[in-house]
């Protein structure tokens, strides 16, 4: 829409930004708010109309901020079972390793809030899928700590703070492409991935049509 992508988006500054998630952990707090709204609306109108999960992606820096403590504590207290937070657990901050500034056990911290908390290999698709299935069955909010390597595949910047918030550079991009055996052009989606995405789009169109049909009277009501 004509703007550079904001790394720390603020509501009201540019078109297309619906909410402030610029300050680290603000997005997590927003997610808690969304999950509260879902629970209230689900109770008021029933699961046929409102019944969805809220997903959050958070990093090490997000969970260091005080706001994440307050919001996560509230989520545990309220038992927001439809809140699932993916924690990009790469042990790197913009200043260097997270060990420079934090030494707490994040999994145990979230368990103390009353959360379901687990750790997985964030590069393993099966582990991610199984963790989501498990989280959906739990009666508490879930933190999925995904152990990852920042700058994955970069020969000289993998697991280093130099790949945090900064471009790899043309030469390193070339080396990373070679290392990952990635031959697609910039911003080109491989055909097999595009085909999979389109299958989900078709599935969701069917689900949308069923939802509208089941709730036609409610969603056309003057109440809304």
Question: Which stretches of residues belong to each language-model region?
Answer:
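Acidic-glycine-rich active-site phosphate/pyrophosphate-binding loop
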Residues: 1-13
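Generic detection of intrinsically disordered/low-complexity segments and helix-coil linkers/edges
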Residues: 2-5, 104, 191, 205
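Glycine-rich ThDP/TPP pyrophosphate-binding loop and its adjacent helix/strand module
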Residues: 13-199
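N-terminal leader/propeptide and maturation segments of large enzyme subunits in energy/redox metabolism
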Residues: 181-224
């Amino acid at each position: 829409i004509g703007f550079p992508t904001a790394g720390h988006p603020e509501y009201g500054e540019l078109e297309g930004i619906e909410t402030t998630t610029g300050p680290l952990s603000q997005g997590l707090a927003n997610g808690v708010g969304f999950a509260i709204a879902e629970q209230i609306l689900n109770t008021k109108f029933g699961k046929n109309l409102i019944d969805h999960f809220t997903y959050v992606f958070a990093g090490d820096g997000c969970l260091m901020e005080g706001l994440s403590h307050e919001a996560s504590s509230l989520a545990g207290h309220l038992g927001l079972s439809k809140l699932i937070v993916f924690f990009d657990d790469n042990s790197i901050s913009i200043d260097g390793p997270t060990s420079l500034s934090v030494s707490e056990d994040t999994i145990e911290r979230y368990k103390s809030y009353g959360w379901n908390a687990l750790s997985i290999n964030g590069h393993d698709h099966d582990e991610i899928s199984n963790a989501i299935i498990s989280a959906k069955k739990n009666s508490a909010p879930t933190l999925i700590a995904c152990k990852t390597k920042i700058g994955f595949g970069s020969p000289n910047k993998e697991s280093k703070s130099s790949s945090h918030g900064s471009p790899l550079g043309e030469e390193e991009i070339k080396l990373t492409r070679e290392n990952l055996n990635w031959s697609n052009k910039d911003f080109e989606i491989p055909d097999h991935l595009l085909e999979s995405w389109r299958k989900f789009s078709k599935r969701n169109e069917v689900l949308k049509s069923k939802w509208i049909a089941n709730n036609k009277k409610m969603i056309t009501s003057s109440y809304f």
